[in-house]
Design a protein with these regions (language model features):
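Anionic-ligand binding patches
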Residues: 2-5, 11-205
């Protein structure tokens, strides 16, 4: 069977998706291995449309079944911002975290928030299935933890009261928005959402 393409150049996302798909019994490949970068515009109105666009474009270009995601952080005090613009709030992860804290400084705490993730699986003929997941918590004022990426060091997950950067990868990959989106995708596939999909019913976690 041809490999499944993970369509991201974000090394943190790539690592998580590889771990979440590890027991699927599939060969996995990625954009770095294939030398592909279509510079897909991530300017859609919502996470579904952006994940759909990335997955379908890379599936068509590669001829491979392709999985892609789009994720955003929604903060209640900022009326759901940065949302789909989370990755474009500033130039890199540290400056994005600093900018978010700057924007929140004038608002009373707690700064409740949630990550939302859409995962799209696309076939080379244009067929697509989507999964969605979220993870609730709040933004904290000081970075904590050495793991994770993005906003993880300032996002305290509601159930554990630890930031996502404080969680071991195995634990994060059981409760994160991305893990829940992949679980949701697999559940939809098990109900026949995408006949011929290379992915199996839910067994990860």
């Amino acid at each position: 069977m041809p490999p499944l393409l993970i369509a991201t150049t974000n090394l943190g996302k790539l690592s998580e998706l590889k771990a979440l798909l590890a027991d699927q019994g599939l060969e996995l490949t990625d954009l770095l291995q294939l030398g592909m970068d279509l510079a897909v515009a991530e300017d859609g109105p919502d996470y579904d449309s952006i994940a759909h666009r990335k997955a379908t474009l890379y599936a068509a270009a590669s001829g491979l079944w392709t999985i892609a995601d789009d994720t955003g952080l929604e903060v209640d005090a900022l009326a759901g911002a940065p949302g789909v613009r989370s990755a474009r709030l500033s130039q890199n992860d540290p400056s994005r975290r600093a900018e978010l804290l700057r924007l929140l400084a004038a608002h009373p705490r707690p700064w409740t928030a949630r990550f939302r993730c859409s995962v799209a699986l696309a076939g080379p003929r244009g067929e697509v299935a989507l999964g969605r997941g979220d993870c609730g918590g709040e933004i904290v004022t000081q970075e904590r933890g050495d793991s994770g990426f993005g906003y993880d060091p300032i996002f305290q997950e509601a159930g554990t009261q630890r930031t996502l950067a404080e969680l071991p990868a195995l634990e994060k990959n059981q409760i994160s928005h991305r893990a829940r989106a992949v679980h949701d995708l697999l559940a939809r596939l098990a109900r026949g959402a995408l006949p011929g999909s290379p992915l199996s019913p839910p067994s990860i976690g």
